[in-house]
């Protein structure tokens, strides 16, 4: 029994232990289920986060690819821009080098032009002082009145030629005087310190040749050498007619008439003192420079290297018919005999009696005078221009010949006279026979133009070669015929030398006009029809006829710019410059503007 009860107790105890273990296992299962549920939730959350991170990474990767593509494009664009900027940099470097060279050239050109303008201003002021109308045309200039640099040039010139200024013991009134011929010779030579006044080789050759030919022997001093071939110098009875207007014509400039009327005994004494005080070389070479042309200023070679060729090309534009007419009319002029009234004036007879050598006696009487053979005929002014005839101050360097009918009141006054053109006057050739004939003639202005010497050399326009050599002959080597622009009225009335005005009134340089202007050498050779040829530009045109007395009437006063008041400048009435050579100041300004455009 006791075993059964023990077994019963052991069975109950085992049953309790089993229920306890079962209860514990249930608790563990519940805990495990909760843990598994938690882990599943965490796993699901981690998967969601992983999906988000994966999507984010995918977006980042796509953005990175897009950025890579954009960066590549930008790099290509930057490379192209760098190449373009390198090319532009190289081009701009070349342009900077070119602009630097242009600036240097422009600076040199500006310096040259400034120096040239200063020299031209000084020379123009000096020429205006020397050549303006004063009490006498043959005014003796004092050395102390001249500018200092020009005084040095005069003294050097006189030392070079082996003479000195007249002493006060011999000529106390003219102790410090310099004749006009010396001043003309000094002005004819270039200033050695100037860049712009280098003469051409032909000019220097002509200077040396002319000095060598003309200084070969002494000759008597003619007053036509120191002063121009004016009727007042040779014929005192014509002085009043030549220098005073007729009573019925209006006079506008009284001061100019006063200067015209003042060839009195003081002027004659000054002439004689000047002729006695200086050696023969100066009196012999007095105004021969006026028969020359103006050489090209070599400082403008950077502007126009072909200006000399253009001048020489312009020199040969005469047709064969024009040359033939010119030569025939010139021969007709030289074959004429002087009339009885030609040498009637006592002053001219006195001058003609001083002929020293047989050569002078042969050459001089034929053409030593350019004045009117009518001593009793008063010179007349043209009528005053009306207000509708606004006229320009006459250009001394104009090359256009006009008819000289001074009684036609309705026409343009400028068309009634022709000032001597330096281009035409200089168009003669230096030949030995002609130079010998000119050296012996008392009036070298007219004979230098009509230079028919021993060899019968052609005068102006004879051939292009002669014209080209005539251009190289010296006259005021620092000037050009084109130095004065067309509109410049810088006191051209005072720059007019009487020999230019005189020959402009009497001897217009168209060829048959020159033959007609001295038609009084044949006593009754009057109103014949002659073909008048204008030796300017390209063509020839006949002009209306005029009697010999009409063509001889205009005096130096009619030809003077002082008698034509410049009321208003009309461009259609301006003188055409057909034969101008070289560069004028206006052309220089045009070239400078062209350089400025290139620099811009």
From Swiss-Prot:
One of its GO terms (biological process) is evoked excitatory postsynaptic potential. The modification Phosphothreonine is found at residue 249. The modification Phosphoserine is found at residues 200, 229, 246, 265, 372, 463, 473, 483, 485, 508, 510, 514, 560, 570. Keywords: Acetylation, Cytoplasm, Membrane, Methylation, Phosphoprotein. Its main location: cytoplasm. One of its GO terms (cellular component) is cytoplasm. Residues 192-222, 298-317, 537-590 are annotated as: Disordered. It is a peripheral membrane protein. The modification Asymmetric dimethylarginine is found at residue 380. It is found in: Cytoplasm; Membrane. The modification N-acetylmethionine is found at residue 1. The modification Phosphotyrosine is found at residue 137. Residues 203-217, 543-552 have a biased composition (Basic and acidic residues). Transmembrane segments: none annotated. InterPro entries: Tjap1/BEGAIN. Interacts with DLG4 and DLGAP1 and forms a ternary complex. May sustain the structure of the postsynaptic density (PSD). This is Brain-enriched guanylate kinase-associated protein. It comes from Mus musculus (Mouse). The gene is Begain.
């Amino acid at each position: 029994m006791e075993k059964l009860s023990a077994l019963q107790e052991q069975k109950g105890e085992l049953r309790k232990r089993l229920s306890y273990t079962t209860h514990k296992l249930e608790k563990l299962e519940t805990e495990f289920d909760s843990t598994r549920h938690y882990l599943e939730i965490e796993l699901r959350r981690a998967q969601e986060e992983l999906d988000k991170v994966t999507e984010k990474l995918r977006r980042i990767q796509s953005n990175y690819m897009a950025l890579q593509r954009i960066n590549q494009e930008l790099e290509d664009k930057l490379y192209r821009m760098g190449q373009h900027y390198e090319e532009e940099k190289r081009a701009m470097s070349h342009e900077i080098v070119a602009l630097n060279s242009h600036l240097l050239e422009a600076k040199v050109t500006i310096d040259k032009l400034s120096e040239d303008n200063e020299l031209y201003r000084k020379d123009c002021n000096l020429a205006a002082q020397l050549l303006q109308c004063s009490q006498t045309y043959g005014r003796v200039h004092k050395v102390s009145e001249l500018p200092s640099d020009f005084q040095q040039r005069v003294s050097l010139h006189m030392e070079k030629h082996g003479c000195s200024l007249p002493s006060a013991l011999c000529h106390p009134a003219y102790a410090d005087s310099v004749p006009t011929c010396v001043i003309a010779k000094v002005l004819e030579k270039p200033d050695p310190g100037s860049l712009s006044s280098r003469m051409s080789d032909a000019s220097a050759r002509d200077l040396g040749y002319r000095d060598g030919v003309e200084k070969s022997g002494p000759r008597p001093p003619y007053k036509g050498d120191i002063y121009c071939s004016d009727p007042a110098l040779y014929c005192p009875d014509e002085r009043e007619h030549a220098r005073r207007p007729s009573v019925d014509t209006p006079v506008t400039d009284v001061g100019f008439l006063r200067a015209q009327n003042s060839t009195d005994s003081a002027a004659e004494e000054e002439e004689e003192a000047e002729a006695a005080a200086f050696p023969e070389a100066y009196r012999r070479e007095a105004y021969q420079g006026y028969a020359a042309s103006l050489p090209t200023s070599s400082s403008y070679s950077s502007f126009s290297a072909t200006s000399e060729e253009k001048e020489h090309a312009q020199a040969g534009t005469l047709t064969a018919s024009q040359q033939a007419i010119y030569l025939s009319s010139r021969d007709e002029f030289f074959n004429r005999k002087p009339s009885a009234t030609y040498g009637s004036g006592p002053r001219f007879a006195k001058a003609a009696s001083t002929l020293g050598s047989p050569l002078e006696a042969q050459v001089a009487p034929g053409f030593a005078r350019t004045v009117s053979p009518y001593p009793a005929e008063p010179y007349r002014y043209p009528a005053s221009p009306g207000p509708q005839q606004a006229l320009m101050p006459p250009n001394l360097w104009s090359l256009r010949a006009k008819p000289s009918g001074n009684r036609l009141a309705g026409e343009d006054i400028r068309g009634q006279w022709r000032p001597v053109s330096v281009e035409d006057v200089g168009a003669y050739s230096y030949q030995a026979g002609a130079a010998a004939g000119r050296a012996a003639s008392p009036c070298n202005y007219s004979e230098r133009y009509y230079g028919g010497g021993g060899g019968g050399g052609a005068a102006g326009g004879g051939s292009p070669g002669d014209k080209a050599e005539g251009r190289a002959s010296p006259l005021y080597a620092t000037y050009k015929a084109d130095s004065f622009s067309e509109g410049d009225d810088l006191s051209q009335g005072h720059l007019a030398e009487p020999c230019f005005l005189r020959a402009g009134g009497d001897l217009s340089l168209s060829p048959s006009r020159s033959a007609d202007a001295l038609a009084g050498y044949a006593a009754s050779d009057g109103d014949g029809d002659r073909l008048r040829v204008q030796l300017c530009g390209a063509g020839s045109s006949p002009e209306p006829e005029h009697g010999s007395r009409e063509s001889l009437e205009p005096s130096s006063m009619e030809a003077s710019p002082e008698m034509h008041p410049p009321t208003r400048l009309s461009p259609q009435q301006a003188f055409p410059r057909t034969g101008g050579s070289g560069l004028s100041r206006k052309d220089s300004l045009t070239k400078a503007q062209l350089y400025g455009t290139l620099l811009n």
